[in-house]
UniProtKB/Swiss-Prot annotation:
Catalytic activity line of the entry: a ubiquinone + NADH + 5 H(+)(in) = a ubiquinol + NAD(+) + 4 H(+)(out)
Protein family: Belongs to the complex I subunit 5 family.
Subcellular localization, as worded in the UniProt entry: Mitochondrion inner membrane
Organism: Rhizopus stolonifer
Higher taxonomy: Eukaryota, Fungi, Fungi incertae sedis, Mucoromycota, Mucoromycotina
Stated name of the protein: NADH-ubiquinone oxidoreductase chain 5
GO molecular function, one term: NADH dehydrogenase (ubiquinone) activity
Keyword Transmembrane annotated: yes
Amino acid sequence: MYLAILTLPLLSATVAGFLGRKIGKTGSHLITCSSLVLTALLALVAFYEVGLCGSPVSIKLMSWIDSEFLLVSWGFIYDSLTVSMLLPVLIVSALVHIYSTNYMSEDPHNQRFFAYLSMFTFFMLMLVTGDNYLVMFIGWEGVGISSYLLINFWFTRLQANKAAIKALVMNRVGDWGFSIGLWAIFWTFGNLDFTTVFSLAPFINEELITIISICLLVAAMGKSAQIGLHTWLPDAMEGPTPVSALIHAATMVTAGVYLLLRSSPILEFGSTALILITWVGALTAFFAATTGLLQNDLKRVIAYSTCSQLGLLFLVCGLSQYNVALFHLVNHAWFKALLFLSAGSVIHAMNDEQDLRKFGGLSRLLPFTYSMMVIGSLSLMALPFLTGFYSKDLIIELAYGHYSFSGNLVYWLASVAAVFTAMYSIRSLYLTFLGYPNGPKINYNNIHEAPLIMAIPLVVLAVFSIFFGYVTKDLFVGMGTDFYNNALFIHPNHSILVDTEFGLPMSMKFLPLIGSLLGTFGVLAIYWIFDELPNKFISTKLGRGIYRFFNQKYYFDNIYNNLLNKFLNFGYTTNKILDRGAIELVGPYGLVNVFKSASNKVSGLDSGFIPTYAMYIFNGLILFITLIFFIGDPRLFVLLLWAVFLLPNNTTQK
C-alpha cells in the first residue's frame, strides 16, 4: 500500500505522457483522476495507521550509492509528519485533477497537462517520503522542473515563458543553498540519512549547526517564496488556474516549510538560525500582506496571501513550534485551494478575465461561487470557528508568548499583517461580487455557473475549510498529544505552547481578531459610504506615491532589473574577458596559435627561387661577419667557427 502511494501518480503520469495519443483526452482524464483519487484514499488509510495508531513504516528499496565514504539507499519513511503532509498533497491534487477535466476541456494539450500534474504530485510525494536528504533533493529538483513545465504550459505566451524562467532561476538560488547544505551535512555527520544526522546533531559544534541551518533556510526561502526570493510567486499566475491551486496549496511552496519541519532536530541547536528564520517569516508576512492590498489581478491577490501565510509558517518555525507550523500548513492548504479554484470558476465564467476592476455584481450571477469564495476568504481571515482560526491566531499568540525582544516585534508585525489580510480579502470580494458591474457586456451575457464536475471539488474543500481545524486541533496541537512521536523535535527550553495558552493576556489574544474586524469594516465603509475617497487619495501626489509603491511590489523587480543585473553583466563580462579571453590567449589556445603563426611565416620563406636563396646566404654571411664586432675575444670567434664546421661531421659519423 505504501509503495502504491508513490507509484500510482508516477504510473498515471507515464501513461498520460507517453500513451496520450493512443488513449486520447478521455483516457488521460480517467487514468490520472482515478489514480489520484485511489492514492488519496490510501493516504487516508496511511494517516489512520501511522498517525492515529502510531505505527510508522520504513521502506528500503535498494542501495543507490555504496562507497567507502557514503551509503545512500532508495528509502522511504512514513511517520506522523509524512502522513500529515500526504493529506493536503494528495487530496488537493486529486480535486485539482477532477476540477481540471472541465476547466481545461477546450485545451488541445490535455494529455500533456495531466501528465505534468501527476508528475508534479509524484515528485512532491518523493520529497516528503524520502528517508535521507539525497532522496529529498531528487524530489526537490523534480518539483522545480514540474513547476517550470506547468507555469510555461501555454508556451506560446511570452509572459508565461518569462514567468517560468523566473521561477526556475529564483529557485536555483534556493537549490544552491540546499546543495551547500547537503555537502555541509555530509562533511559534518558523514552521512545523509535522517536517523544518523538527527541522532548526532546534539553533539556537533554550534557554529557548524548554524551554518547548516542557514543553508537550509536559504533553500526553504527559495522554494517557499520568502522575501528577497519571492518575486517568482506572483508571476507564476501565468499558468493555468488549477496549476496555481496545486502550487500554492499543496506542493512547491510547502516544500520549503517541510524542509524546516523535517530538519527540526538540527535547527533546534542553532539559535542564531532560529532568530533569522523568525525575522524572515515576519518580514515576509508583513510585506506580502501590504503588497496584496493594492493588486488588481484576482489571482495575484491570492498569491500574495499565500506568500504572507508562508511567512507566518516560517515565523512559527523560528519560534520552534513546529507542530503549530504543520497544523497551519495543512489548514492553509484547504482554504487556499478553495480560493484559487473559486477564482478559476470566476475567470472561467468571465471569458478568462482576471482584472478586479472589470468585475462586479457577480453575487447574483454566480451565487455558488460567491459562497465558496466567502468561506475561503473568512477562513483565511481566521474568523472564529473556521479552520484558519485554530492555527493562524495561535501563531500570532505564540510570537507574543515567546517573551523576547524579537517575539514582541514579530507579534506586532504579524498582527498588522493579519489586519491587511482581512482588508485585501474583503476588497477582492467586494470588487468581484458586490460592486457595480464594470466588465464588458458580452462577459455578463455569456456568464455561467461552475458545472457539477467543477463544483464537487469546491464543496469538498469548503467542508475542510470549515471543519478540519476544529476536528484536528487536539490531535495536532493539543496538550500532551503523542501524535508526532519522534517525527518533530522541540527542545524543552523552547516549549512555550503551555505558557501561551494559559499565561497570555486576553487583550493580546483578541487583538489580531479585533484588528481584522476593524480592517473588514473599514474596507466596506470605504467602498459603500466613502466611495470617492480612494480616487481622491490616489489623485494626490502622496497617494500616487503610496499606491505605486505597493502596487509595484516595493520595486523589487525594478531593483533586480536595474541593479542586480548590472552586477551579473559585470560578472559575465569579466568571465568573457578573463576566462575566455586573457587566460585562453596565454594558455593552450594562445600557444597553439603562436606556433601555427610562426610555422606559417617560416614556411613562407621557402619560395623555390635561386635568387632568393642567394639573398638568404648573403644575409647570413653578413650576419656571421658582424659577430666579429660583437665578440671581443678572437678565441671565442675561432671556437664558433670550429663548432660550425665540425658539428656536421660528427653527425655524419654517427
